[in-house]
Amino acid sequence: MSTPHWFDQGSLVLASNNKGKVAEFEKLFEQLKLPVEIIPQGHLNIPDAIEDGLSFIENAIIKARHASKISGKPAMADDSGICVPVLGGAPGIYSARYAGEHGDDAANNAKLLNDLLPFRKNGEAIEGMFVCVLALVTHAEDPLPQIFQGIWHGEILEAPRGENGFGYDPLFWLPELQVSSAELSKEEKNKISHRGQAMQLFRESLQK
């Protein structure tokens, strides 16, 4: 297996201070059996980057470069969110602060439900998708960031269901499984989620 030189360093900074994301990533790396130590940027006192990009890809790269510059280590960043076509793709890159305050899951969910009220017709399903973009940089000025993208299709419920996960998981319905994302275990979710898909592509890149 040919691996990039950064892989031999044995550690990778995860450019996130989101506890839910960090927990999912730690579980994903454990499941994928990758011999890489994941160091959440908070453990290195790295503050959040200013996300001023206009796309998931741009923001993921911004966050990865920020963490790599401060730590001097390779860094991986996740930029993810939920996109609803009838809302023009919103909440999109603003998913974490959709209701105003960053990371207020309850308020974000309530705003999404309220914004969808005019589109609820005769019980018709409203399509939604979770998007995850991972950006990996070997150093802060890496001219060729590696990008891995996962998209998870589903529907938006009219009320929350389930106690697991975080973010919009309680509103994300999987018709083929007849459960919400918040009703899946971490292991079940990681096998099929947007983040799980992107991580699998990352793993495959290490085997090329």
From Swiss-Prot:
Record-listed substrate binding positions: 16-21, 80, 166-169, 189, 194-195
Binding site for Mg(2+): 79
One Pfam family of this chain: Ham1p_like
Cofactor(s) annotated in UniProt: Mg(2+)
Reactions catalysed: XTP + H2O = XMP + diphosphate + H(+); dITP + H2O = dIMP + diphosphate + H(+); ITP + H2O = IMP + diphosphate + H(+)
MF annotations from Gene Ontology: dITP diphosphatase activity; ITP diphosphatase activity; metal ion binding; nucleotide binding; ribonucleoside triphosphate phosphatase activity; XTP diphosphatase activity
GO terms under cellular component: cytosol
Cofactor descriptive note: Binds 1 Mg(2+) ion per subunit.
EC number, as in UniProt: 3.6.1.66
Record-level GO BP terms: nucleotide metabolic process; purine nucleoside triphosphate catabolic process
Keywords: Hydrolase, Magnesium, Metal-binding, Nucleotide metabolism, Nucleotide-binding
Entry-linked CDD domains: HAM1
Active site per the UniProt annotation: 79
Function recorded in the entry: Pyrophosphatase that catalyzes the hydrolysis of nucleoside triphosphates to their monophosphate derivatives, with a high preference for the non-canonical purine nucleotides XTP (xanthosine triphosphate), dITP (deoxyinosine triphosphate) and ITP. Seems to function as a house-cleaning enzyme that removes non-canonical purine nucleotides from the nucleotide pool, thus preventing their incorporation into DNA/RNA and avoiding chromosomal lesions.
NCBIfam families xrefs: RdgB/HAM1 family non-canonical purine NTP pyrophosphatase (TIGR00042)
SUBUNIT field: Homodimer.
Similarity field: Belongs to the HAM1 NTPase family.
Name used for this protein in its record: dITP/XTP pyrophosphatase
Organism name: Acinetobacter baumannii (strain ACICU)
